[in-house]
């Protein structure tokens, strides 16, 4: 017919119409820079380079900067009392910095460190080991960043802390091991939250992260800051089945018992009192977060109670806004424990990472005391929190630099404490605002969907 062209003619016409775009090196350079800074796909390039850079940097630090003795000698003295002297009464185990106050997982790990470093004879071996521990933790946390689609400019922040490097390779604190197991736990939870079509794998991963979480707690109790969010996450992963969730809790308790068997058999009361002493007092002079107060107010039980109440209010607000149906789902599961319950509007892939990471940050904000090594508890989550808070590219790094200054300010002082409190409060408020706006949008979307379905039915 007239006006029609054959396919061959159309292809020929397309070839004739193609015009190669002009070469614009400046625009290409800008696009490349924009890609490397803002596009999460660039993390496949950025992350390996950062890990390589960190590996070399840690080597240089170990070689050029003198080891700083703070707690490692005390760890070794305590292990000697347990391993060489056969002391199993926790209340009698002590070192240069005081009594043993960590659970049996700490003892298990530092027995290995005692063998590696031969007590205090070869601390340099311990530094090398902690270098690998740092790099492993960094690689795992970057896996979390990749799954959560963080832009590269946020990822880079994970490698910029002077204080964190010293905590690992210059001081050999036990906090580093707890952080490793918590990163593994959160990574496992993120992966499990995406296993919508593989329920058996999801529940198996829930059991695995219960074990790794318990391992973290058995090294140092700061991992308990994750506990409320951990139970909610397991509840969601188990499709709101309270029995399966309780079985995961039993798995946590089982590890605590297994790792502490020698002490529980001999002196159970002393072990539980020393390893899980929630009333332990912290030294005011080394607490970097409340130096704007005097020592008397810092040690006041009313202040501790106010922090606890504020902590609980913040956690409750977090859970209710992120998972509004938590109470109805829990009640339904209690009424029908053997039935598979639908977790409505929970959105596991977003809810689980958010409640885990945000609840830990809330716990840090309302902690009675933060010593310098405690930075490792939450530093690895800062790139995620900054990204979630919606901070612009030019604001996030400024916040981070100020935050790092607070942790490097020595000795602890009121100016750094006040600024740290302000920075962390602002970050939490920004998280709350973005979360609230997201919840409102989700509720409106759900309402529109429900109304549309009702109209179709009518």
From Swiss-Prot:
It catalyses: an alpha-D-Man-(1->2)-alpha-D-Man-(1->2)-alpha-D-Man-(1->3)-[alpha-D-Man-(1->6)]-beta-D-Man-(1->4)-beta-D-GlcNAc-(1->4)-alpha-D-GlcNAc-diphospho-di-trans,poly-cis-dolichol + a di-trans,poly-cis-dolichyl beta-D-mannosyl phosphate = an alpha-D-Man-(1->2)-alpha-D-Man-(1->2)-alpha-D-Man-(1->3)-[alpha-D-Man-(1->3)-alpha-D-Man-(1->6)]-beta-D-Man-(1->4)-beta-D-GlcNAc-(1->4)-alpha-D-GlcNAc-diphospho-di-trans,poly-cis-dolichol + a di-trans,poly-cis-dolichyl phosphate + H(+). GO terms for biological process: dolichol-linked oligosaccharide biosynthetic process; protein glycosylation. One of its GO terms (molecular function) is dol-P-Man:Man(5)GlcNAc(2)-PP-Dol alpha-1,3-mannosyltransferase activity. Its EC number is 2.4.1.258. The chain crosses the membrane at residues 42-62, 96-116, 138-158, 172-192, 217-237, 243-263, 303-323, 346-366, 382-402, 416-436. Pathway: Protein modification; protein glycosylation. Dol-P-Man:Man(5)GlcNAc(2)-PP-Dol alpha-1,3-mannosyltransferase that operates in the biosynthetic pathway of dolichol-linked oligosaccharides, the glycan precursors employed in protein asparagine (N)-glycosylation. The assembly of dolichol-linked oligosaccharides begins on the cytosolic side of the endoplasmic reticulum membrane and finishes in its lumen. The sequential addition of sugars to dolichol pyrophosphate produces dolichol-linked oligosaccharides containing fourteen sugars, including two GlcNAcs, nine mannoses and three glucoses. This is Dol-P-Man:Man(5)GlcNAc(2)-PP-Dol alpha-1,3-mannosyltransferase. It comes from Saccharomyces cerevisiae (strain ATCC 204508 / S288c). The lineage of its organism: Eukaryota, Fungi, Dikarya, Ascomycota, Saccharomycotina. The gene is ALG3.
């Amino acid at each position: 017919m007239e006006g029609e062209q054959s396919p061959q003619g159309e292809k020929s016409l397309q070839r004739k119409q193609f015009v190669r775009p002009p070469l614009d090196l400046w625009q290409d350079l800008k696009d490349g820079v924009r890609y490397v800074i803002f596009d999460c796909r660039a993390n496949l390039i950025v992350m390996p380079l950062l890990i390589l850079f960190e590996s070399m940097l840690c080597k240089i630090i170990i070689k050029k900067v003198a080891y700083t003795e703070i707690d490692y000698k005390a760890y070794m003295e305590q292990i000697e009392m347990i391993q060489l002297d056969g002391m199993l009464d926790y209340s009698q185990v002590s070192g240069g910095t005081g009594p043993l106050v960590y659970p049996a997982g700490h003892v298990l790990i530092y027995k290995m460190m005692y063998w590696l470093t031969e007590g205090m004879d070869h601390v340099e071996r311990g530094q090398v080991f902690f270098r690998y521990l740092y790099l492993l933790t960094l690689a795992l946390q970057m896996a979390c960043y990749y799954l959560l689609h963080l832009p590269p400019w946020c990822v880079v922040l994970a490698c910029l802390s002077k204080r964190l490097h010293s905590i690992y390779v210059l001081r050999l604190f036990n906090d580093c091991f707890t952080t490793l197991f918590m990163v593994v736990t959160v990574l496992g939870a993120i992966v499990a939250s995406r296993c919508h079509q593989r329920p058996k794998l999801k529940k198996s991963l829930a059991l695995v992260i219960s074990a790794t979480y318990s391992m973290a707690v058995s090294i140092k109790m700061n991992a308990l800051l994750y506990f409320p969010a951990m139970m909610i996450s397991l509840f969601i992963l188990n499709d709101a089945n309270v029995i399966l969730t309780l079985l995961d809790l039993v798995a946590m308790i089982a590890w605590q018992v297994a790792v502490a068997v020698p002490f529980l058999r001999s002196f159970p009361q002393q072990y539980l009192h020393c390893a899980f002493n929630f009333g332990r007092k912290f030294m005011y002079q080394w607490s970097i977060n409340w130096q704007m107060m005097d020592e008397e107010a810092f040690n006041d039980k009313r202040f501790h109670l106010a922090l606890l109440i504020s902590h609980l209010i913040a956690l409750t607000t977090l859970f209710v806004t992120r998972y509004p149906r938590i109470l109805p789902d829990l009640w339904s599961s209690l009424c029908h424990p053997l039935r598979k319950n639908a977790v409505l509007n929970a959105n596991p892939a977003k809810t689980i990472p958010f409640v885990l990471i945000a609840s830990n940050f809330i716990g840090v904000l309302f902690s009675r005391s933060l010593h310098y090594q405690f930075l490792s508890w939450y530093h690895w989550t800062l790139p995620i929190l900054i990204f979630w808070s919606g901070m612009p590219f030019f604001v996030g790094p400024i916040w981070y630099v100020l935050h790092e200054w607070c942790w490097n300010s020595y000795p602890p002082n009121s100016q750094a404490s006040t600024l740290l409190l302000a920075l962390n409060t602002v970050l939490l408020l920004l998280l709350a605002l973005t979360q609230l706006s997201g919840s409102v949008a989700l509720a409106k979307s759900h309402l529109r969907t429900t109304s549309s379905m009702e109209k179709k039915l009518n």
